[in-house]
Amino acid sequence: MKIPANGFTHAGKFHADDVFATALLQIIRSDIRITRGFVVPDDFDGIVYDIGFGMFDHHQEPREYRANGIPYAAFGLLWRVLGPGLVGERQARLIDENFIQPLDLNDNTGEQNSLCDAIGFFNPVWDSKEDQDTCFFKAVAVAKQILENQIDSANAVNRADEKVQQAYKNSRDGIVILPCYLPWKNGLYKTDALFVIYPSQRGGWSAQCVTDHKTKKPKLPFPQSWAGQPQEVIEQKSGIEGISFCHASRFLITAKDKETALTACRQVLKNNGRL
């Protein structure tokens, strides 16, 4: 879809929905001119959203609903059309599920959402002399940065997928070893991988459990006796020198080097009858 040079949305109090919808349009077309008003001019030539009962409004009946029952708001309607071109179909769906749907739900039902509250606080208070449109575009600038970060992160996952898949093909016993830190969850989400080992951004190496795509819990967590313990206790309990940390939730350890992390994962496999 080609974005026209002009956009129109409602005036008055603004919400996360129209703010993020505007941010999305600005990301795609930086020179778009946004007008706010209470009535769409008959001769308006551009994209209209969150007002006017058109393709990108959600105040009319019948409304559009997702398969899970969550109604679309203007941001979700725009993202459905424009998102795949920015990040691909899979990542667009994930951003909708994890980021946009809660905003759409808030706009349609008033359900509590902290990000929506934060955007709402940009509205001038009752006795303020601030111009409402100025406040609106301040909120849009913040929303644009947030959304750009989402898009950048999604595309980073897309770039990492090939490397993650290659590491998975080379893996043994359910242990995937990455050459560097990569966003790996997207690539291993529905595989039989059990652990991922990678150089830690804090130094040393990390080993992390792969979660079950249905339960969202680690398929094979690290031992309870390691969880949240100091290094000397973990080393004593495991018999492995160099494991410096095990998260209390048992999904992550850090170790001095790759071999130590690999030894720890193999011990868990052996103790659970997987080797």
PLM features: residue spans?
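N-terminal ordered "arm"
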Residues: 4-46, 50
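C-terminal accessory domains and tails appended to enzymatic cores
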Residues: 18, 22, 37-39, 63-69, ...
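Short helix-capping/linker segments at secondary-structure and domain boundaries
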Residues: 28-32, 83-91, 215
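Short alpha-helical "patches" and their helix-cap loops
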Residues: 32-42, 89-105, 136-137, 157-158
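Short loop/helix-cap segments at secondary-structure boundaries that form the rim of catalytic
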Residues: 40-45, 54-55, 187-189
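A basic- and aromatic-enriched beta-loop-alpha substructure that forms the phosphate/nucleotide-
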Residues: 46-127
